[in-house]
């Protein structure tokens, strides 16, 4: 029998999809546009290594400082475990904003490769990180816009 | 009893969501991708007030001219009112393209904040503006990519 981990519900006249377990909103079909639910994580340090859950929150702001820093992605196993139902070929994305005064390089972890390791996020720049699942516990991170 | 401001309809074999009153499309679950309906606003001026209606349309093409320009956000109240059903934590996106010759800087309106006020959109660059509802009357704008 089919099971569901998400539910849809009419709220204030719009169709909202929620996590069935936690009831956290996911996405809403509004009257004009899609509404995407996001949770912001802020990091104040030279280097950042947010958790899989923080990446999945959707926005990471980084007050980079002291010297050139790194943003280390979680392992593929941790990311895969955190996104229930993600199929091979599907993606999740995260907005990353460098609000500090140092250049940041996105750094791989076990099970996640970075498509362009030469690309950096300079101060007051931002990027969209797209994680494409290529196999169980395995992703490629595509780095857009900085 | 639940009421709905959007409706879903099967059209040409794909599932399209429309504004129930105006019948304007919102988004479509296509056979390959999610299709997002967007309306383009063209601005030919040094400065622009980024109105709630422009944000709702989804794409602004700004031919900046004369000198460095300012893109001033509408008020938080107006932006939130433009998206019925928008809840705290929800976000909407607006693509902002500077196809002119001058540098553009975002400026706050009442009830709006900009995460990184130092970030600009230079000539022939573009940004994704992620507008996140923080409270009943306030939003924060995250500028991605310029």
What are these regions (language model features)?
Chain A
Residues 1-32:
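Register-specific beta-strand positions within repetitive beta-rich fiber domains
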Residues 20, 24-110, 119, 123-125, ...:
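Exposed extracellular interaction/assembly regions and N-terminal maturation sites
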Residues 113-114:
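A conserved acidic, glycine/proline-rich C-terminal tail/linker
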């Amino acid at each position: 029998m089919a099971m569901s981990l998400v539910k849809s519900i009419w709220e204030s006249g719009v169709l909202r999809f929620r996590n069935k377990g936690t009831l956290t909103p996911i996405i809403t079909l509004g009257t004009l546009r899609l509404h995407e639910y996001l949770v912001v994580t802020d990091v104040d340090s030279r280097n950042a290594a947010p958790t899989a859950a923080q990446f999945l929150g959707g926005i990471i702001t980084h007050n980079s400082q002291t010297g050139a820093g790194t943003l280390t992605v979680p392992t593929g196993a941790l990311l895969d475990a955190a996104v229930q139902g993600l199929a091979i070929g599907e993606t999740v994305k995260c907005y990353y904003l460098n609000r500090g005064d140092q250049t940041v390089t996105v750094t791989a972890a076990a099970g996640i490769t970075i498509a362009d390791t030469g690309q950096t996020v300079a101060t007051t720049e931002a990027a969209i990180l797209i994680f494409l699942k290529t196999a169980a516990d395995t992703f490629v991170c595509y780095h857009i816009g900085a | 009893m639940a009421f709905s401001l959007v409706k879903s309809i099967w059209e040409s074999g794909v599932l399209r969501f429309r504004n129930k009153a105006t019948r304007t499309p919102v988004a479509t679950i296509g056979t390959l991708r999610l299709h997002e309906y967007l309306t383009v606003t063209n601005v030919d001026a040094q400065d622009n007030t980024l109105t709630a209606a422009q944000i709702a349309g989804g794409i602004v093409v700004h031919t900046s001219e004369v000198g460095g320009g300012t893109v001033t956000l509408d008020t938080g109240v107006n932006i939130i009112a433009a998206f019925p059903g928008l809840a705290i934590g929800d976000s909407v996106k607006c693509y902002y393209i500077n196809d002119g010759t001058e540098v553009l800087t975002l400026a706050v309106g009442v009830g709006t904040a900009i995460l990184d006020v130092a970030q600009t959109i230079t000539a022939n660059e573009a940004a994704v503006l992620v507008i996140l509802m923080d409270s009943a009357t306030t939003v924060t704008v995250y500028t991605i990519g310029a």
